[in-house]
């Protein structure tokens, strides 16, 4: 078996080695030749450049903790907004909480009379003024009760103010007395007195003095 197959294998081997490779031809007949590639293959190595100065992260989380949320925005941190908020009665820490409550109550009571008079259920009757004034006074009473409940739930009697005693620059300041049980009680009492006074003053201007207002 081996003697008979060896001549065939040798003939096949010699045929493959001696036979010339067929060169492909184009459509017109001549052999195709390879064109030189217009691209130039270059190789380079990318290496990181070591800077002389150490880099640092420009935007960092609050206090270095990424899990702490910050509510500071360009609007809330602008000097104009800070000036406006610092002049509101609730944020004037140098003013007594009682006087702050009176000022806030006067504004609320005075402004609540008009909507109740013109949009109340008795707006088309002759009792619109009296009903609207009483409704505004009732809302002031309800708001005063809500402020009282908030003070009882948030502050403990006899404990000092929970407001911070340091500014952002580290300067010591007097804690806001409004953030205490006694200060909040004064604020609530002032709000009730100011609110009722504001309602009374608005009713007096519209219906007692009988001034030529746009609506009554």
From Swiss-Prot:
The chain crosses the membrane at residues 135-155, 189-209. Its main location: plastid. It is found in: Plastid, Chloroplast thylakoid membrane. SUPFAM superfamilies: Photosystem I reaction center subunit XI, PsaL. Residues 156-188 are lumenal. GO terms for cellular component: chloroplast thylakoid membrane; photosystem I reaction center. One of its GO terms (biological process) is photosynthesis. Residues 48-134, 210-216 are stromal. The keyword Nucleotidyltransferase does not apply. Pfam families: PsaL. It comes from the Eukaryota. Residues 1-47 form a transit peptide. Keywords: Chloroplast, Membrane, Photosynthesis, Photosystem I, Plastid, Thylakoid, Transit peptide, Transmembrane, Transmembrane helix. The N-terminus is blocked. It is a multi-pass membrane protein. Belongs to the PsaL family. This is Photosystem I reaction center subunit XI, chloroplastic.
